[in-house]
Amino acid sequence: MKKLSLFLLLLGAILPNKQAAAGISGQAATLESQAATPAWQPEQAGSILVSQQAPKHEVRAVWLTTIGGRDWPHSYAQSPISARKQQQELCQILDRLQQAKINTVLLQTRVRGTMIYPSALEPWDGCLSGFPGKSPGYDALQFAIDECHKRGMELHAWVVTIPVGKWDALGCRNLRRKFPKLIRKIGPDGYMNPEDSRTGNYLAQICSEITRRYDIDGIHLDYIRYPENWNLKVSRQQGRNYITSIARKISHAVKSLKPWVKMSCSPVGKYDDLTRYPSYGWNANTKVCQDAQGWLRDGLMDALFPMMYFRNEHFYPFAIDWQEQSHGRIVVPGLGIYFLDPKEGKWNINDVIPEMHLTRNLGMGYCFFRNQFLLNNQQGILDFTRRFNEYPSLVPPMTWASTQKPKQPKALDIKWRNGYMEISWQNEASYTDGTAIPTPHIYNNVYASRTYPVDVNDARNLISARRLGNMLLLKPEECEKPLYFAVTSMDGYGTESLATQEKAADVLLHRHAEGSARMLYCDGKQVHLPEITKNLDTRVFLVETLQGSTVYRATSEGNYINIKPLSPGAYRLYSVNKRGIRHALGTFYKKKFKEN
């Protein structure tokens, strides 16, 4: 009853009245009829869809497909030059995802019995070099991990499990030769037999190889289920036992190596029939023997990314069901934005927007299928995502795996250097109890606010997330008004330390006494003078470049000085009293001013 009441409340807030009434009546439409559903209109939404602040912790993910180069790569690496072109394309993709504040990339790593890294178990996939079995001349997985981590993103190795490609393709042939009678043929394709114990053992080997060799943030299992056309000759419960055995073998293998690596999978989008909302025969638990909610309960999975490529009553009650059965773990609905392409479906962007709002309200986040349709800005989905993700976010911490807090950063220092504001600190690779942090990196989160001390629980103050290294440079235009800073450390489980704030004495020194770190407000025509100016016997104001050359002299016009003659750029402002003593008032950045 609780679930139904919550759903009806949300449905009434999201859908037009006629749609809500249809949901209440229990007359669910078929999937095919959804194309005729009227688009959701913003003015019809309740407060659940407005005044939402982007949360500090939220998974914002994308599936990045490599099979056939669908998302990447779009060219082959057959020489050092073409390999570099391929790498540059990935960097451009990641740059655009970073701008949209996406924090998790699920990269297809095992494609169809083939790999995008030099594996001792399976051959190269042909998506990189153009030739199955041939190296592109570099390790694509390692490159992607490095580039994601540079941008503060998590990289999860997406492993396609049961399907192994066309019967006569390289990956399938290799496995048929290696494991006689393990591969079953359905139509033109080969599949690993879920009921053969060798399947789970071998997939655990693959995931162990990836986990051991690479600094991945997660293993993401795809198609860990029975094929829909499989002739199931055992009971549904026995079928679930077989699939769960595979999941257990993989999970135990990964966690024995690196317990901070997130185990996840992408189950079918509806777990099972609900009391008032049927799945119409396509669900995880009954149809394909995928007990994904049980895997969360039993600790075999840290996260689920259910493929919820549906709308309206086919989406909302099932999203709530996933959230209610999350067992304190991470559940991230996969959104079918590929249907925004008229070649793929007849969706309107207003089918997706309320789904994003609802999953945010439920604390779930979202995952886009797939990258191409996001970055192609299909129906403006990328533009909306940029607005929706106003601030960076952190992936929720794995509190069920570790609660130890890293030690705070120390020696926080803020100063101007070569035209940039430099924020630096030092890390300690240990927890507060003195034990060593086992994860490969210590990450850092930088916060900034116009009030002191900085509230690190406020998502609006997070300016750099999951940062490697111990320094951040800000351009003058990024800190035009006075800012105060704080830094936290974070381990691979996502657990944050307490915040290290600027010392109060340093704040007073930098903002008031010495003054050079104070950012002065400039509207392009005038610089507003700080309060401290009232206490100075100022005769004239000097404007210098950051290199120390005086370029302008002015007198005040009340509480500001006119700087229209100055060229755009960064400058320091000084007051000079009648005795010739200079006082640093602060730094300002003049943008190009446009007359109305």
Give the ranges of each region predicted by the language model.
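Substrate-binding cleft of secreted/luminal carbohydrate-active enzymes
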Residues: 292-293, 297-315, 332-402
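Catalytic domains of carbohydrate-active enzymes, especially glycoside hydrolases
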Residues: 88-114, 214-216
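Short, surface-exposed loop/turn motifs with a glycine/proline- and acidic-biased composition
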Residues: 479, 555-579
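C-terminal tail/sorting-segment detector
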Residues: 510-514, 528-530, 568-596
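Active-site-adjacent "subsite" loops/lids of carbohydrate-active enzymes
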Residues: 56-59, 63-88, 156-213
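Beta-strand-rich modules
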Residues: 474-496, 573-575
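Aromatic-lined carbohydrate-recognition surfaces of secreted/lumenal glycan-active proteins
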Residues: 154-166, 220, 239-285, 331-340
